[in-house]
Amino acid sequence: MVVGMKKGKLYLKRMISIVLLFSLPLAYNICTQFRFDADTQRLEAYYLEEPNSIDVVLLGASDVYSGYSPSYAYDKYKYTSYNYSIALNSVDLYAAQLKEILSTQSPDLILIEISSVFGTDKETEESVLITKHRMIDAVPESQNRKELIDSFTTLEDKISCYFPFFMYHGVSNMCETNINKISFSNTHQNLLKGVYIGVADYIWDDDFCSIQGVKTATEPSKECMKKINNLLKICDDENINVVFTRFPHRMTKAKLERFQYGNFLKGYLQKLGYGFLDFEATVEKNFDYYKDFTDGEHLNGVGQRKLTEQIGKILTENYGIKKRKLPEKCKKDWECSAEYTKLFYKYYDSIRETPNDELKKIYGEKHLWENKELIDALKQYNEE
């Protein structure tokens, strides 16, 4: 009898161990099922927009979502827009992203930033892998999503799309982050339309390089031009009204070659009849390296407002972009977003009254983007 009880306890312990062995990874996988960062929030929120309500979509990498504010543009110029942009984005994924853009919207114009074209082969390979995962984490189930998953070359990458534990097991705060996401995503309304800016500025002046008057144009690699021509064919086949752009960057000697590539591509695209908005060639005239940039690649909240106003003015005056008639609820949502964005910039400006060296100590390289922490901070700031 005693022996039987011991065996029973042993079997029970083994059963519990087996259950825990499978249930704990499963529970962790559920908690990491939906990665929540600024990129995921921005892309997921795109599908919350009223279908066929967006006038302009911007496609690009981190310099786009840190340089342009859709709700600020709405407040100033009354057209609707959205940043379908991802950190480390690559032109290799633009075809899939254009499909996603057109799956719910019929924009009058798509503005494509060209910086994602100029990465090295190694940089492109790494950025495609990372960006593809970010897209898959955010986009709804569709044939396009399935094709993205199928395009991975390794079994591990394919499996990680269904079991994110394999992709994010090294991210220690993922569970807590996604628990916050679950409660936040069920209540927020995409108030800031994917806006993103750094708190402190990290600017060094030892390697500045003036580009005023530099017109040298260097042809990119054959592979790069092939990707550009493939993109143009897609835009032509889909009858997409596309304009290209080059956002401002803090120019250094190391980036001069990229600038010269951009000069070539600008001339190439203009000869083919495409519009091209070049904000980099005039960066020294229209932007201040010390006051408008958070680092070498990205504008801060001051520069973001400057560039948004410049883009809005050009699109409305030169490209015929004007507000479309929106359903009443959609119009109220955009007006609400514009008001929240005003509050957001007030909050940002109040933080920036602290000297930059102190901001670095307090915030490090922290960024402001639409999450529960920021929305709560804005509400508290508004009440003070």
Give each language-model segment a name:
Residues L12-T32:
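Hydrophobic membrane-insertion alpha-helices, especially the h-region
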Residues M1-L10:
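N-terminal Lys/Arg-rich, disordered targeting/topogenic segments
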Residues S127-E238, L326-E383:
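Secreted/periplasmic serine-hydrolase-like ester/acetyl group-modifying domain
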